[in-house]
Amino acid sequence: EGANLLFDERYDKTNRENNDLDGNKWHADKVIEYFEKRKTELNKKPFMVFLGFSHPHDPRRGKKKLLEKYGASNPDPPKKINSKSPVVPINYLPSHPFPYGDPDIRDENSVEGVYLSRSELTIRNEKGKDFACIEDMDFQIGRVLEALKESGEYENTYIFFTSDHGIAIGKHGLMGKQNLYEHSWKIPFVVSGPEIKKNTEAKGNIYLLDVLPTLCEIAGITIPETVDGISFNKVLRGKKNKVRNVLYGAYSGGFKPGMRSIKKGNWKLIKYDVMDGAFTMPRKVQVNQLFNLNKNPNELLIEHQNEGVIAITKNMPKKNQINLAENPKYKSRLQKMEKLLFSEMEKVGDPFKFWNQK
């Protein structure tokens, strides 16, 4: 709330219905109105706008025409699969292979029209709803950018497009974001602005907390000592490919305080030390997952080689596209990644201790 007080103007409303009164269009309208007001200002000061949309987010109540475009129905799925609905993701599973600690979280069992279902029909319908919401947001962003161009300030403005997290919607048998697979940990990140070469891509290796120091450097503002992030301004300008060699992930909600991940190069380790969530005789779940993301970018598991799953995904995984943690051939790699993870946990002051962590 304190940060919000630093803005000269603030408009705050959250609505995930499919109307234009206070949904995505309302958010875009407020920014467009601000640009219109700036046209009349004689002594314009540099501006910063933070625009956060209500969608996409469950319940994914898309607009009727867009739902029809993506073969989806609201709120519940149709009686049979609509051929226009998006196909299931390549790493779809009908259930997660092991209890991972959050049996009652809303994202996993209370999403409107989904609940506990992970059928092909349900997931394809939910993907269609998600696409409908995303396209509506995309349209509203287009309106904002057009208004910025009309204001004459587009060429001198840095634009950051991103999100707070990804989402599963059927991937690995999950629905929400409370996991450390790539589909939920990674986020979209697109930047445009002066001296940023168009249509280029960089590895980056950044955290969202790196955005603040980057904005400070771009604006010529001294980066506060309290900021933990690293500016990736040189990455934006093509002078560097990345600012971090290691990425550390943690999730501590529900019954799973012990879910951590580490990434370096092509290798990624996810480590679970959680309770299974059972209300009678709960048990520990201790699992390692080791992936080579270059060879297995979708983090496919042995369960993805099930004939029933392949019949739905239409994808035949390669033999080595599995969790490699139990393979003796990769014992040394697992140990190196564990050592790196434990080192990073100590560096950031993570109080949790895994079963084999000294």
Language-model segments: residues:
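Active-site-proximal cap/lid insertion segments
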Residues: 11-21, 36-206, 218-226, 278, ...
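C-terminal cap/loop subdomain of S1 sulfatases and analogous C-terminal strand-loop tails that border
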Residues: 18, 39, 165-171, 197, ...
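Alpha-helical elements of Rossmann-like donor-binding domains used by nucleotide-donor carbohydrate transfer enzymes
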Residues: 26, 30-33, 143, 210, ...
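Residue-level signal for nonpolar/aromatic packing positions in well-ordered secondary structure
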Residues: 31, 77, 85-87, 141, ...
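Active-site segment of extracytoplasmic enzymes that catalyze sulfate/phosphate-ester chemistry
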Residues: 1-13
